[in-house]
């Protein structure tokens, strides 16, 4: 749920850092970062610092940073918690497209609409499994 963006770096630099850490060259890191930032609807905010972004924009940049290296497994805790309905839809559509590209996405959400789109659903109550839907 925490965004943990680096305050001294722009949005695109925050995303690039993850790509550079994966040993991508700077040009590829920047291209891939910009592609992801565009997919989350923030191309026009790419050169802004976290202090200049709203909470929802920071969340979308943090998601961009998490997926820029195309991880096989994505763990997301309330990935749309700070987002309005339109942006939440955009993020979940992006995550579900990634799922369809042989990736595993595990997410926690209080949003029943998005929870019901999952292939498998586990409901918790007071820290204990309440129901399990789907094959596990």
Task: Give residue spans per PLM region.
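Short coil-to-helix segment of the ABC ATPase nucleotide-binding domain corresponding to the Q-loop/switch region
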Residues: 9-17
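ABC-type ATPase nucleotide-binding domains, specifically the catalytic core motifs of the NBD
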Residues: 16-28, 39
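Conserved ABC ATPase signature
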Residues: 49-53, 57-58
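Hydrophobic anchor residue at the start of the ABC signature
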Residues: 63
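A short, proline-enriched helix->beta-strand linker immediately N-terminal to the Walker B motif
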Residues: 68-72
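Catalytic Walker B motif of ABC-type/P-loop ATPase nucleotide-binding domains
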Residues: 74-77
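Helix N-cap at the start of a conserved alpha-helix in ABC-type nucleotide-binding domains
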Residues: 85-87
């Amino acid at each position: 749920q925490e965004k943990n963006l680096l305050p001294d770096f722009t949005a695109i630099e925050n995303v690039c850092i993850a790509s550079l850490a994966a040993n991508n060259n700077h040009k590829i890191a920047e291209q891939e970062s910009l592609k992801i930032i565009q997919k989350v609807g923030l191309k026009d905010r790419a050169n802004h610092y976290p202090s200049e972004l709203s909470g929802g924009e920071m969340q979308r940049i943090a998601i961009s940073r998490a997926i820029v290296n195309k991880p096989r497994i994505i763990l997301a805790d309330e990935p749309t918690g700070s987002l309005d309905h339109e942006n939440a839809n955009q993020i979940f559509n992006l995550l579900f497209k990634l799922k369809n590209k042989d990736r595993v996405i595990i997410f926690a959400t209080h949003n029943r609409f998005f929870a019901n789109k999952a292939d498998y659903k586990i409901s918790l109550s007071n820290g204990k499994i309440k129901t399990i839907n789907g094959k596990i």
